[in-house]
Amino acid sequence: GLDYPKTYIFSKGDKTTDFKFDYPVIIKPSDSVLYWQFPFEGMNKAYVAKDKDEFIEITNKIYSGKYNKSLIIQDFIPGDDSYMRVLTCYSDRNAKVKMMCLGHVLLEEHTPTAIGNHAAIITEFNEELMNKIKTFLEDINYVGFSNFDIKYDSRDNKYKLFEINLRQGRSNYYVTSSGNNIAKYVVKDRILEKNLDLKVQKEPFYWHVVPNAVVFKYVKDKELVNKVKKLISQGKEATSFGYNRDLEGNFK
């Protein structure tokens, strides 16, 4: 099976503050579409509550507005941004996984409404983890793109899955730039109805949306920083904000 953080589903009016796991806890809306329709002062994409008092304060703030769906409460897994992983997959019309690209997150965004969005990634290969998720997707006959947020838990040496997004992720250019053009998979599978071979990304590639200097400064693991520098020197680097053709013909 798949490992995931201990979780509690909290509904409006629920008085529970003691869970089967300790504080701190993560708080996030179960219906993000509805949540973002009703902005409020102090609104965050996700929250960390250090204790019961802070938990009550945060949940009261969320439910004081028009959001009325449930909240997902999860055990907080320790570790900085570099403990995160992201896996993007494509399953064809026959529910067979045809592309897998795992990213080792180096940095995430830290503004309140964007917290958790990936800002720098190196692709990596983890056969055991990827095979687990491949089996899961095929067992449930999943079709289309899937995007998994994962964090390594040093307490038990397991990779815990936070969620599956039924789409490509915001940072999906880490997939295309490393040699797995996501648009081609859809066209070949759904329009041309070709049979695709399974492609698993094994070679490391560096993608980022923040300047390299920010990565060098804020990534705490210097082995990862050295790996980034090596990939840059090898030309295995891409950024979503750097596309030379954007400026073609604009300068003489």
Identify the function of each model-found stretch.
Residues A95, D156-N157:
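Glycine-biased flexible loop/turn sites that connect beta-strands or occur in inter-domain linkers
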Residues M43-A46, K50-D53, D75-N141, N165-R190:
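ATP-dependent carboxylate/phosphate-activation module, predominantly the ATP-grasp catalytic core
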Residues N157-R167:
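A short beta-strand motif that forms the metal-chelation/ATP-contact edge
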Residues K188-K252:
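Peripheral (often C-terminal) accessory segments that flank ATP-dependent C-N-forming ligase machineries
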Residues G1-I72, R93-N94, E127-N131:
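Active-site nucleotide/adenylate-binding loops and adjacent lid/helix of ATP-dependent enzymes
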